[in-house]
């Protein structure tokens, strides 16, 4: 009897509510202090366990194999190799999040793959063990596996659960692809923000150390951020290109969205301190 398809596994987007760069390590990675929060806008994945070890991915992206697709298959393969599981999976990705942009969609897809297949394959790895696999694939993946809003240090892997407010956001996705590698290699990127205690960071105005550099190089990001600042406190997430404005009420965010210039793409979402992936994990 063929296995049933396990449906509707969410892979939520994240925002970096602040992002500080504290230095550069000998291995080239950067020391960071950042605050991750999820938003209720997600890619969705379905999974079917197979008896043979093949990993097959289907996507709604018109046959385009994107980085997130590759990361999904790499995550599944890593779980197979770590656990010795000799079956496989067929995976369907419904891609709804903007590609790249600093929302973490590819990392989130990989995290959901690890969490879902660990359950469906009955491989019984702990959250920490899954996070170790995820960290080898991408620095942002552990926060999606743990599934709670978090203050992160190191390269982003040392996580401390936090409970910031859950406002409404208007997220704008400029028509620009910002290379994370290029941003972190740029000599003009500030790398000397002092490390601060979490209590201090949570109570002071929030900023993104990558924003000034990206805005100077990408006029589309500068234009989107400039427009958004007319309506709400706003900044960039990750290394961009997405920017977000913060609103206390949904109606305020929707009212601003209604005025969005036609050449810009945006959406309204609410902050979430608990990932919908964790909620889904408790269901069959």
From Swiss-Prot:
The keyword ATP-binding applies. GO terms for biological process: isopentenyl diphosphate biosynthetic process, methylerythritol 4-phosphate pathway; terpenoid biosynthetic process. Keywords: ATP-binding, Isoprene biosynthesis, Kinase, Nucleotide-binding, Transferase. The keyword ATP-binding applies. GO terms for molecular function: 4-(cytidine 5'-diphospho)-2-C-methyl-D-erythritol kinase activity; ATP binding. Its EC number is 2.7.1.148. The active site is at 14, 140. Pathway: Isoprenoid biosynthesis; isopentenyl diphosphate biosynthesis via DXP pathway; isopentenyl diphosphate from 1-deoxy-D-xylulose 5-phosphate: step 3/6. It catalyses: 4-CDP-2-C-methyl-D-erythritol + ATP = 4-CDP-2-C-methyl-D-erythritol 2-phosphate + ADP + H(+). Gene3D superfamilies: 3.30.230.10, GHMP kinase, C-terminal domain. ATP binds at residues 98-108. NCBIfam families: ispE. PANTHER family: 4-DIPHOSPHOCYTIDYL-2-C-METHYL-D-ERYTHRITOL KINASE, CHLOROPLASTIC (PTHR43527:SF2). Belongs to the GHMP kinase family. IspE subfamily. Catalyzes the phosphorylation of the position 2 hydroxy group of 4-diphosphocytidyl-2C-methyl-D-erythritol. This is 4-diphosphocytidyl-2-C-methyl-D-erythritol kinase. It comes from Shewanella baltica (strain OS223).
């Amino acid at each position: 009897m063929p296995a049933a398809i396990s449906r509707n596994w969410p892979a939520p987007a994240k925002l970096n509510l602040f992002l500080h760069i504290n230095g550069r390590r000998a291995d080239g990675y950067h020391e960071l202090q950042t605050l991750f929060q999820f938003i209720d806008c997600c890619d969705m994945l379905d999974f079917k366990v197979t008896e043979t070890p093949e990993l097959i991915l289907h996507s709604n992206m018109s046959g385009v194999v994107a980085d997130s697709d590759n990361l999904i298959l790499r995550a599944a393969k890593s779980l197979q190799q770590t656990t010795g599981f000799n079956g496989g999976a067929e995976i369907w990705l419904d891609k709804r999040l903007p590609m790249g942009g600093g929302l973490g969609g590819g990392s989130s897809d990989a995290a959901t793959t690890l969490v879902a297949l660990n359950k469906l394959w009955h491989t019984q790895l702990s959250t920490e063990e899954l996070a170790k696999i995820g960290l080898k694939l991408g620095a942002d993946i552990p926060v999606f596996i743990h599934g709670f809003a978090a203050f992160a240090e190191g390269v982003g892997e040392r996580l401390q659960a936090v409970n910031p407010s859950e406002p409404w956001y208007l997220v704008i996705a400029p028509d620009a692809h910002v290379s994370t590698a290029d941003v972190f290699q740029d000599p003009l990127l500030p790398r000397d923000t002092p490390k601060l205690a979490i209590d201090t960071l949570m109570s002071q105005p929030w900023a993104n150390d990558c924003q000034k550099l990206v805005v100077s190089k990408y006029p589309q990001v500068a234009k989107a951020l400039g427009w958004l600042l007319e309506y709400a406190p706003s900044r960039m997430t990750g290394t961009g290109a997405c920017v977000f404005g913060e609103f206390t009420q949904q109606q305020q965010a929707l009212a601003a969205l209604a005025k969005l210039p036609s050449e810009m793409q945006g959406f309204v979402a609410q902050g979430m301190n608990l990932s919908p992936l964790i909620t889904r994990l408790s269901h069959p």
